Amino acid sequence: MNHTSDTALLIVNLGTPEAPTAAAVRRYLGEFLSDRRVVSIPPLFWKPLLHMVILPIRGPRSASKYAKVWLQEGSPLSVYTRRIAEGLTQHLPDWRVAWAMRYGAPALTKALDALQAQQVRRIVILPLYPQYSTTTTASVQDVVEAWCKRTPQVQVECIQDYAEDSAWVAAVAASIRRHWQAHGRSEKLMFSFHGLPQRVANNGDPYPQRCQVSASLIAAALDLNESEWVLGYQSRFGAERWLQPYAEPTLWALAESGIRRFDLVCPGFSVDCLETLEEVALGFSETLAARGATMRYIPCLNDDPAHVQALAGLAQRALL
């Protein structure tokens, strides 16, 4: 059946500032941190704190970090997400393929409107978050559900997650093997995932379990025993307790125990971005070097052909 005119895949990533400037970062963070899925503090208290304290401080500070990793084509997250969409058109020639961001541009609602204007009747939404969380995937679903209420004639399927999808697991494992073949193997492999307030997990968010499943499956695909890998959580924000173990202090403790060479991969990130390139590849490496250890960062899958093929398979199965 030819789906050219009526079926589409819309991949959705988190979002990014449009430029590595304080003003652009403030706009982006203002939208991101105003999502009640991300920050659940009552708006009456949160909005003044956000706009009067947090954004004026974090805007310039984060802009300088973005500048370190910005590509000639733009933000790494945006560049790689677009390339994935372009690659998907090769695997899904009878589909329309589009991409959007939950925060910033291209806006999710505008992308949905554009597909409807092209007479699309079925849309598969694929949030590029391998592990489901109420703070990420559910936020995308909120926007999609609101859009569907005013556009009931379009059939929409939203993929929940792909934490244990065999093709995705194989793609991550293959990328690690290629790294080892090119650079040799270190003493310990860390799987570092974006953190989450412990409070959110206590309220039933399955994210930590999904991360554990992904890490265990990738480790099994690499024939690693439990002593050869470790899981950690990064990117903590604020003062409250987040999921543990925290990635960077865990690396420090392992270095102090005598381990000197680490490899680190971030399977919770579909593409490289500020958190992987600046926080991990640059930041973690620097603090470990100060402790006499080395860390090599293994890039995200980005537009790796095996990654693109795995995502295409997810989209096709969503309509079965």
UniProtKB/Swiss-Prot annotation:
<feature type="binding site">
    <location>
        <position position="275"/>
    </location>
    <ligand>
        <name>Fe cation</name>
    </ligand>
</feature>
<comment type="similarity">
    <text>Belongs to the ferrochelatase family.</text>
</comment>
<dbReference type="GO" id="GO:0046872">
    <property type="term" value="F:metal ion binding"/>
</dbReference>
<dbReference type="GO" id="GO:0006783">
    <property type="term" value="P:heme biosynthetic process"/>
</dbReference>
<dbReference type="InterPro" id="IPR033644">
    <property type="entry name" value="Ferrochelatase_C"/>
</dbReference>
<dbReference type="InterPro" id="IPR019772">
    <property type="entry name" value="Ferrochelatase_AS"/>
</dbReference>
<dbReference type="GO" id="GO:0004325">
    <property type="term" value="F:ferrochelatase activity"/>
</dbReference>
<keyword id="KW-0408">Iron</keyword>
<dbReference type="InterPro" id="IPR033659">
    <property type="entry name" value="Ferrochelatase_N"/>
</dbReference>
<comment type="function">
    <text>Catalyzes the ferrous insertion into protoporphyrin IX.</text>
</comment>
<keyword id="KW-0456">Lyase</keyword>
<dbReference type="Pfam" id="PF00762">
    <property type="entry name" value="Ferrochelatase"/>
</dbReference>
<keyword id="KW-0479">Metal-binding</keyword>
<keyword id="KW-0963">Cytoplasm</keyword>
<feature type="binding site">
    <location>
        <position position="194"/>
    </location>
    <ligand>
        <name>Fe cation</name>
    </ligand>
</feature>
<keyword id="KW-0350">Heme biosynthesis</keyword>
<dbReference type="InterPro" id="IPR001015">
    <property type="entry name" value="Ferrochelatase"/>
</dbReference>
<protein>
    <recommendedName>
        <fullName>Ferrochelatase</fullName>
        <ecNumber>4.98.1.1</ecNumber>
    </recommendedName>
</protein>
<keyword id="KW-0627">Porphyrin biosynthesis</keyword>
<comment type="pathway">
    <text>Porphyrin-containing compound metabolism; protoheme biosynthesis; protoheme from protoporphyrin-IX: step 1/1.</text>
</comment>
<dbReference type="GO" id="GO:0005737">
    <property type="term" value="C:cytoplasm"/>
</dbReference>
